[in-house]
Amino acid sequence: MAQTALISVSDKTGILEFAQALHALGIKLLSTGGTAKLLADAGLPVTEVADHTGFPEMLDGRVKTLHPKIHGGLLARRDLPAHVAAIQEHGIDTIDLLVVNLYPFEATVAKAGCTLEDAIENIDIGGPAMVRSAAKNWKDVGVLTDASQYAVALAELQAGGKLSDKTKFAFSVAAFNRIADYDGAISDYLSAIDFDASIGQASPTRSMFPAQSNGRFVKVQDLRYGENPHQQAAFYRDLHPAPGSLVSAKQLQGKELSYNNIADADAAWECVKSFDVPACVIVKHANPCGVAVGKDAAEAYGKAFKTDPTSAFGGIIAFNRPVDGETAQAIAKQFVEVLMAPGYTPEALAVFQATKVKQNVRVLEIALPPGGTTDWDNGRNLMDVKRVGSGLLMQTADNHELAASDLKVVTKKQPTPEQLQDLLFAWKVAKYVKSNAIVFCAGGMTMGVGAGQMSRLDSARIASIKAEHAGLSLKGTAVASDAFFPFRDGLDVVVDAGASCVIQPGGSMRDQEVIDAADERGVVMVLSGVRHFRH
């Protein structure tokens, strides 16, 4: 008995060629609406579902395939005599292949100006119903929900006349995953809408925090272990990754990425993306230990490394410009876990292939988005999620950027243009340092970083000690504090270390006391009005 394929797709990529190949194998074609017309116009013999069921499409196409002749043909188990007898009694033919992709709900709601009515009309009913039926009966029915599966299916059909159980099961799992993703997207969209009973319609605005959140991720790879060897781990990505994000990285060489590599690489990449000029960020344990800008990648790296050569050992290095041979030669003198950049010259790649040890360096390439570095803003995470016991904390991501016009000078002494530039640089870096964060900067480079201390005083002292160990003078430096100084003692510590200007959010009950102390010490203080806690 000839096999039958039911084809009904919204995305028609590759479907005509696939249907032609199925026809060449003697497989009968069933189809609906626009798909049927496409196949018929190409000269393929195709039976409309309405002719197959004897029941016309109705309700503006809302009811097409919701019929026993369709679902009976998909759900009937060929190995159960009772099932076979039942479909024969009711004149139901079996369906062996189902090729369906769904109404483009996700693409519709992503469009500017999408209304609730637009969204509702793009909720597929018949497609998911057929997919579930076919996926449930995977031993007898192959269900294809993505054009990427066509080649796999066709190769097996041409080789052996049928799909293997392994392939059918894999397709079934993919189908259920697709339905879960689809229903999750609908739930997320509708859960974020407030219905205004007074006017009988939905609000035109949507909440960023829906009543129910349906996290949907795809596994990229299993990892050797988690943060520690006794922990198991895997790396997942969003269903639709943003351009220029870490998950789009291509590993050009080196060992397999570890859990800690990925966590640190993300911290480095997000920081370096925030600079418009050539920049280098070196990260250790999710904290920047050296950040600098320069005329090119080589200069930026040299300055960043100079901040804290000890901590840079075994670090993660990120650039926002391609790496050339000169820069690679400088990096190769150190032990590096991960190197990441938008690109590499052949000379740079050759440096890391020169010895077996250098071949272990994990070299990642993250292609620039179509709009170049300026388009990286579009690839930032919009939400941050943190797991707590049996729950999640969700917040909008800290993507706030500061301009010179946003600053409020609160001291008698005014900042010079050079000091303003250093203050803005220090503030940008401080956002990526674990709280409590104190960052000394000068000349487009970090001079000392104090991170993750319970006391702001201790962070300031550590930053000063780091600079001393690196042989750097803090005289005349700019200092950023990610949160306000609760007392003047923190200010005194950074000024004693050599700072000439300070940027902090303000907002303390003792702001005036701290400002008066700045005037007393003869330093500049500006307020950002924004806090950058990072935990």
Swiss-Prot record:
One Gene Ontology biological process: 'de novo' IMP biosynthetic process
InterPro entries in the record: AICAR_Tfase_dup_dom_sf, Cytidine_deaminase-like, MGS-like_dom, MGS-like_dom_sf, PurH-like
Signal sequence interval, chain numbering: none
One of the record's GO molecular function terms: phosphoribosylaminoimidazolecarboxamide formyltransferase activity
Superkingdom of the organism of origin: Bacteria
UniProt keyword annotation of Metal-binding present: no
Reactions the enzyme catalyzes: (6R)-10-formyltetrahydrofolate + 5-amino-1-(5-phospho-beta-D-ribosyl)imidazole-4-carboxamide = 5-formamido-1-(5-phospho-D-ribosyl)imidazole-4-carboxamide + (6S)-5,6,7,8-tetrahydrofolate; IMP + H2O = 5-formamido-1-(5-phospho-D-ribosyl)imidazole-4-carboxamide
A GO-annotated cellular component: cytosol
Biochemical pathway: Purine metabolism; IMP biosynthesis via de novo pathway; 5-formamido-1-(5-phospho-D-ribosyl)imidazole-4-carboxamide from 5-amino-1-(5-phospho-D-ribosyl)imidazole-4-carboxamide (10-formyl THF route): step 1/1; Purine metabolism; IMP biosynthesis via de novo pathway; IMP from 5-formamido-1-(5-phospho-D-ribosyl)imidazole-4-carboxamide: step 1/1
Residue ranges annotated for the MGS-like domain, each copy included: 1-145
Keywords of this entry: Hydrolase, Multifunctional enzyme, Purine biosynthesis, Transferase
E.C. code: 2.1.2.3, 3.5.4.10
Pfam families listed in its UniProt record: AICARFT_IMPCHas, MGS
Residues in coiled coil: none
Free-text note on domains in this protein's UniProt record: The IMP cyclohydrolase activity resides in the N-terminal region.
Family as reported in the entry's similarity comment: Belongs to the PurH family.
Entries under HAMAP family matching the protein: PurH (MF_00139)
Official protein name in the record: Bifunctional purine biosynthesis protein PurH
Record organism: Variovorax paradoxus (strain S110)
